[in-house]
């Protein structure tokens, strides 16, 4: 993407506040025109002094324009600052909203720290560009566009010096941009690596400390910082060279203007006031050209991060649903997977040609080895992904034809990882339903066997749980997650190994709550426990993305297939309160009795 396209796209974000932006632009143009008039008026004052004429009128006009310039500059600075700050926060919020709608696979591939780093650095760069556009860029362009024609009307010979100076600045800028383009892109990559390392180590600080990795991880960060310096310094060298060349060209131009001016005055071809005006023009032009050079530097520096941000914006925009998508209402819970196929890109993993039907109120247990596609099946139900082939229907409606918001409103999920926010206990439960009353929150906690341990905390329901629930035990985290699902009160329930971290006593309490919750609700359970599978109306055995077997527990156990093999191998966890029966090597005695199982 060219530098001009990047700049233009950055400016398009200001269109949301069109009136404020236009007002700032008009004020900036007025400031530029007033600034241009100052050297002319100053020259007239000097000429009036030289001619011993009336200096009061030009002085008064000069003072009036100076006062107006000050007020306009303050107005522009104040308005531009506020507008740039508002748009920075606005773009950050809009982009954040799109980011959190992206599928999990996108976040896993890109990395959370990468997306966060891109968002923060890009919005900071956009803020700087917007601010400089309204404060300096526009006034600089207007000033340069009017300065040369005005100077040419005064003296063509002196104007050539200013034109040559402008050409030299342009040539130097083009040279440096060409030399630093690839280097600046490399700098941005090293910035990402450094940020990712910091984020990775801090999020795993317990591992870093327990394995005595503090010195090693710090040294790794030093290495990343050194690589960043090695990539950054050549770029900085080119811009330092550009600054020196620009300063040399501007100094030489001032000398030429003074020498030519003095020569023309002695020959009677120019007045002293006109020479003074040209000196003011030269100083003004040098200042504006320096601003242009700084602007190019800013844009080149921001180029890589903005290109990455725009690519991220385009990717998230493609995920946005069209307006007026139908909602899924009055869900009964009849669910059909009709020849559903989905495969993760370049992985060979997914689910293939899966078909089954679940009647309203039925409980489905999904079992199978690791990587069988159990979680993928659930993610497809919630439209984290859309099928590549086939269709998923709820109450006869294809889920792709309804809004994700309404679909997910109909599904309450208890994830394997509880996924708690660094907020209070009540706020975490209230994620299930934001407008729930305190009494409803407490009732959900009681149903999930969480109320007693919450009250035992120092702040009760106002206790902050820490980052990802770090201040709670594994069982406490899962009970809050279950309370959240209970509070949501959705017609479809998904439990992803929801009771795996609970002790026997607590699990029994939670199981009763879940049984009550799942009554008359369509329930999917990714199950590792025998009791869960036994009580299910339908068991789906997944392996390598294929639905190998389906039916009731007894049907599959008696069939002598893969599910029966899983039972014989003890692949489902026994309840802790049930004593394990010994297995004699070489015998056909199973670890627990299964009616009709085949030896």
From Swiss-Prot:
<feature type="transmembrane region" description="Helical">
    <location>
        <begin position="55"/>
        <end position="75"/>
    </location>
</feature>
<dbReference type="GO" id="GO:0005524">
    <property type="term" value="F:ATP binding"/>
</dbReference>
<dbReference type="GO" id="GO:0005886">
    <property type="term" value="C:plasma membrane"/>
</dbReference>
<keyword id="KW-1133">Transmembrane helix</keyword>
<feature type="domain" description="ABC transporter">
    <location>
        <begin position="335"/>
        <end position="569"/>
    </location>
</feature>
<keyword id="KW-0813">Transport</keyword>
<dbReference type="InterPro" id="IPR003439">
    <property type="entry name" value="ABC_transporter-like_ATP-bd"/>
</dbReference>
<comment type="subunit">
    <text>Homodimer.</text>
</comment>
<dbReference type="GO" id="GO:0015441">
    <property type="term" value="F:ABC-type beta-glucan transporter activity"/>
</dbReference>
<keyword id="KW-1278">Translocase</keyword>
<dbReference type="Pfam" id="PF00664">
    <property type="entry name" value="ABC_membrane"/>
</dbReference>
<dbReference type="InterPro" id="IPR011527">
    <property type="entry name" value="ABC1_TM_dom"/>
</dbReference>
<feature type="transmembrane region" description="Helical">
    <location>
        <begin position="156"/>
        <end position="176"/>
    </location>
</feature>
<dbReference type="InterPro" id="IPR017871">
    <property type="entry name" value="ABC_transporter-like_CS"/>
</dbReference>
<dbReference type="GO" id="GO:0034040">
    <property type="term" value="F:ATPase-coupled lipid transmembrane transporter activity"/>
</dbReference>
<dbReference type="InterPro" id="IPR003593">
    <property type="entry name" value="AAA+_ATPase"/>
</dbReference>
<dbReference type="GO" id="GO:0016887">
    <property type="term" value="F:ATP hydrolysis activity"/>
</dbReference>
<keyword id="KW-0812">Transmembrane</keyword>
<keyword id="KW-0547">Nucleotide-binding</keyword>
<dbReference type="InterPro" id="IPR005896">
    <property type="entry name" value="NdvA"/>
</dbReference>
<feature type="transmembrane region" description="Helical">
    <location>
        <begin position="276"/>
        <end position="296"/>
    </location>
</feature>
<dbReference type="InterPro" id="IPR036640">
    <property type="entry name" value="ABC1_TM_sf"/>
</dbReference>
<keyword id="KW-0762">Sugar transport</keyword>
<feature type="domain" description="ABC transmembrane type-1">
    <location>
        <begin position="21"/>
        <end position="301"/>
    </location>
</feature>
<keyword id="KW-0997">Cell inner membrane</keyword>
<feature type="transmembrane region" description="Helical">
    <location>
        <begin position="248"/>
        <end position="268"/>
    </location>
</feature>
<keyword id="KW-0067">ATP-binding</keyword>
<dbReference type="InterPro" id="IPR039421">
    <property type="entry name" value="Type_1_exporter"/>
</dbReference>
<feature type="transmembrane region" description="Helical">
    <location>
        <begin position="22"/>
        <end position="42"/>
    </location>
</feature>
<keyword id="KW-1003">Cell membrane</keyword>
<feature type="binding site">
    <location>
        <begin position="368"/>
        <end position="375"/>
    </location>
    <ligand>
        <name>ATP</name>
    </ligand>
</feature>
<dbReference type="Pfam" id="PF00005">
    <property type="entry name" value="ABC_tran"/>
</dbReference>
<dbReference type="InterPro" id="IPR027417">
    <property type="entry name" value="P-loop_NTPase"/>
</dbReference>
<comment type="function">
    <text>Involved in beta-(1--&gt;2)glucan export. Transmembrane domains (TMD) form a pore in the inner membrane and the ATP-binding domain (NBD) is responsible for energy generation.</text>
</comment>
<comment type="similarity">
    <text>Belongs to the ABC transporter superfamily. Beta-(1--&gt;2)glucan exporter (TC 3.A.1.108.1) family.</text>
</comment>
<keyword id="KW-0472">Membrane</keyword>
<protein>
    <recommendedName>
        <fullName>Beta-(1--&gt;2)glucan export ATP-binding/permease protein NdvA</fullName>
        <ecNumber>7.5.2.3</ecNumber>
    </recommendedName>
</protein>
């Amino acid at each position: 993407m060219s530098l001009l396209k990047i700049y233009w796209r950055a400016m398009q974000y200001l269109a949301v506040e069109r009136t404020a932006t236009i007002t700032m632009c008009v004020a900036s143009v007025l400031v530029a025109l007033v600034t241009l008039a100052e050297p002319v008026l100053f020259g007239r004052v000097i000429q009036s002094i030289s001619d011993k004429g009336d200096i009061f009128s030009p002085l008064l006009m000069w003072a009036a324009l100076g006062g107006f310039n000050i007020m306009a500059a303050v107005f522009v600075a104040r308005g531009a600052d506020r507008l740039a700050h508002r748009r920075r926060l606005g773009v950050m919020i809009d982009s954040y909203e799109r980011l959190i709608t992206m599928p999990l696979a996108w976040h896993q591939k890109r990395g959370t720290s990468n997306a966060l780093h891109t968002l923060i650095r890009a919005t900071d760069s956009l803020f700087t560009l917007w601010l400089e556009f309204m404060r300096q860029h526009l006034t600089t362009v207007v000033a340069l566009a009017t300065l040369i024609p005005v100077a040419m009307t005064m003296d063509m010979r002196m104007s050539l010096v200013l034109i040559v100076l402008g050409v030299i600045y342009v040539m130097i800028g083009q040279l440096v941009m060409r030399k630093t383009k690839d280097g600046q892109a490399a700098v941005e990559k090293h910035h990402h690596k450094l940020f990712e390392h910091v984020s990775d180590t801090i999020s795993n600080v317990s591992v870093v400390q327990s394995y005595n990795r503090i010195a090693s991880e710090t040294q790794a960060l030093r290495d990343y910082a050194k690589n960043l310096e090695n990539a950054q310094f050549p770029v900085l060298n080119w811009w330092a060279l550009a600054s020196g060349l620009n300063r040399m060209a501007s100094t030489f131009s001032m000398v030429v203007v003074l020498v030519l001016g003095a020569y023309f005055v002695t020959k009677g071809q120019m007045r002293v006031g006109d020479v003074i005006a040209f000196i003011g023009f030269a100083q003004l032009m040098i200042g504006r050209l320096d601003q242009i050079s700084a602007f190019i530097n800013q844009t080149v520096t921001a180029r890589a991060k903005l290109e990455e941000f725009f690519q991220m914006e385009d990717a998230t925009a493609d995920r946005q649903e069209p307006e007026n998508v139908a909602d899924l209402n009055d869900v009964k819970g009849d669910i059909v997977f009709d020849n559903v196929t989905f495969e993760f890109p370049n992985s060979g993993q997914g689910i293939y040609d899966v078909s089954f039907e679940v009647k309203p109120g039925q409980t489905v247990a999904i079992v199978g080895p690791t990587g069988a596609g159990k979680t993928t099946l659930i993610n497809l139900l919630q439209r984290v992904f859309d099928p590549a082939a086939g269709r998923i229907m709820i109450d006869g409606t294809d889920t792709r034809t309804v809004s994700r918001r309404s679909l997910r409103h109909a599904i309450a999920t208890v994830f394997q990882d509880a996924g708690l926010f660094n907020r209070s206990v009540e706020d975490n439960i209230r994620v299930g339903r934001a407008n729930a009353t305190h009494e409803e929150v407490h009732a959900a906690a009681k149903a999930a066997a969480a109320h007693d341990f919450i009250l035992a905390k120092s702040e009760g329901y106002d206790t902050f749980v820490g980052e990802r629930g770090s201040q709670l035990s594994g069982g406490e985290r899962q009970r809050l997650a279950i309370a959240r699902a209970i509070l949501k009160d959705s017609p479809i329930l998904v439990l992803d190994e929801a009771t795996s971290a609970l002790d026997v006593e607590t699990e029994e309490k939670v199981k009763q709550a879940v049984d009550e919750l799942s009554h008359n609700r369509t329930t999917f359970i990714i199950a590792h426990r025998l009791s869960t599978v036994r009580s299910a109306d339908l068991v789906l055995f997944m392996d390598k993305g294929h639905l190998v077997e389906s039916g009731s527990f007894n049907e599959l156990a008696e069939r002598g297939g893969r599910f029966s093999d899983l039972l014989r191998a003890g692949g489902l966890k026994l309840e802790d309160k049930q004593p394990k029966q010994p297995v004699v090597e070489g015998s056909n005695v199973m670890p627990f009795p299964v009616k009709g199982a085949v030896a």
